[in-house]
């Protein structure tokens, strides 16, 4: 469960600041849901101070050593579908995130990997999934 702390409008999208109510972790996330469609509403229903079940994807790539923006991930579930896209559910400390499967498939063998994460993206709020994950069958496998 996350609490929406703030939003910041950018040119064609926005950033949201979320606080994990269980762990206290603050996540600054990119929100690309600015083009809602009838079938796929965006995340603009979120209100400051409201609490929501959020899924956040770590955007980046496998890392061979620790460095800036690098996190230690432990695999919680190696195969999760969100919309039509395949993800790996990971734990970073006590927090749960998602990583595109195709970006880490070579690092899943021992159940842990380093991941360089310069950005976090909000991909699901409650039952609303970012529309692009339904539009393209098989994308990001």
Language model: regions and residue ranges:
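Beta-strand/loop nucleic-acid-binding surfaces
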Residues: 24-46, 91-124, 131-134
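Structural detector for short beta-strands of small beta-barrel domains
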Residues: 1-12, 65-91, 113-115, 141
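Compositionally biased, intrinsically disordered low-complexity regions enriched in proline and serine
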Residues: 16, 53, 88, 98-101
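OB-fold/S1-family single-stranded nucleic acid-binding modules
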Residues: 55-79, 116-141
């Amino acid at each position: 469960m996350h609490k929406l702390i703030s939003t910041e409008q950018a040119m064609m999208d926005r950033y949201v600041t979320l606080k994990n109510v269980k762990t206290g972790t603050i996540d600054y996330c990119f929100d690309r849901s600015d083009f809602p469609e009838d079938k796929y509403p965006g995340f603009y229903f979120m209100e400051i101070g409201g609490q929501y079940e959020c899924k956040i994807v770590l955007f980046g790539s496998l890392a061979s050593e620790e460095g800036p923006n690098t996190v230690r991930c432990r695999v919680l579930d190696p195969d999760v579908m969100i919309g039509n896209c395949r993800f790996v559910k990971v734990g970073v400390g006590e927090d749960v995130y998602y990583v595109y499967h195709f970006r880490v498939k070579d690092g899943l063998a021992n159940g842990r990997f380093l991941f360089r994460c310069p950005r976090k993206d909000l991909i699901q709020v409650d039952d609303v999934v970012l529309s692009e994950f339904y539009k393209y069958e098989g994308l990001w496998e």
